Amino acid sequence: MRPLSMSGHFLLAPIPESSSDYLLPKDIKLAVLGAGRVGKSAMIVRFLTKRFIGDYEPNTGKLYSRLVYVEGDQLSLQIQDTPGGVQIQDSLPQVVDSLSKCVQWAEGFLLVYSITDYDSYLSIRPLYQHIRKVHPDSKAPVIIVGNKGDLLHARQVQTQDGIQLANELGSLFLEISTSENYEDVCDVFQHLCKEVSKMHGLSGERRRASIIPRPRSPNMQDLKRRFKQALSPKVKAPSALG
């Protein structure tokens, strides 16, 4: 087939008659929280690129944006990575304030600890409580993730510990290995995306674009009829008999 030439005749794609014909992807805003060196950045990059990168410079808070498909729905996904080492109880006020702004922005949360670091596990409950403090009236979904599940020889946190904490907080719990299993990482993010969609009542439908509807174009028969009426002599209708 020959390529289209702009110098010849071409067809215009139909313009939507109204805003209901134009669909925008859903906006999903997630935050990944947890102590330092638990693999938060590696999880995000693994999900978005399928690649595992083991060593990262200390994270200062990067925002990742990507269009992704989850169960056939296109999502405009934003994932906020957060610095590690933030302790809610004893951090500086400006640090806690920065974390609060991130929590306020996000709609769904991954709380990540490493199974090789018991202190990172202990940081999960205060983070969860801070989320509920910032979102007191919200059902914002939270998933607790035990990462580095491949390092069994260095395990400090048992699987049952993660399950028990999740049950106490009313959250889902998953133990994964970011380095060895892309599917598990993908499942975590996809499940959280679906929970956020359900929270906003957006499942199965797309958010409509806020564009001004254009007037409906008259069809050809209407144009012909109106043209004939304009050319025909005007005839005065007979008055009704009394």
Swiss-Prot record:
Binding site residues for GTP: 34-41, 81-85, 147-150
UniProt-annotated stretches for the region Small GTPase-like: 17-241
Induction behaviour: Down-regulated by TGFB1.
Keyword Transport: no
Enzyme class of the recorded protein, top EC level: hydrolase
GO cellular component, one term: nucleolus
A Pfam family this chain is assigned to: Ras
GO-annotated molecular function: G protein activity; GTP binding
Superkingdom in the source lineage: Eukaryota
Localization, UniProt: Nucleus, Nucleolus
Reaction(s) catalysed (UniProt annotation): GTP + H2O = GDP + phosphate + H(+)
Enzyme Commission identifier(s): 3.6.5.2
GO terms under biological process: positive regulation of transcription by RNA polymerase I
Record has Hydrolase as a keyword: yes
Main location class: nucleus
The entry's keywords: GTP-binding, Hydrolase, Nucleotide-binding, Nucleus, Transcription, Transcription regulation
InterPro entries, per database record: P-loop_NTPase, Ras-related_GTPase, Small_GTP-bd, Small_GTPase
Tissue specificity of this protein: Widely expressed. Down-regulated in prostate tumors compared to normal prostate tissue. High levels found in colon tumor and normal colon tissue followed by small intestine, liver, jejunum, ileum, bladder and aorta. Lowest levels observed in endothelial cells.
Protein family (similarity comment): Belongs to the small GTPase superfamily. Ras family.
Subunit structure, as described in the record: Interacts with UBF/UBTF.
Function as written in the Swiss-Prot or TrEMBL entry: Regulator of rDNA transcription. Acts in cooperation UBF/UBTF and positively regulates RNA polymerase I transcription.
Protein name per UniProt: Ras-like protein family member 11A
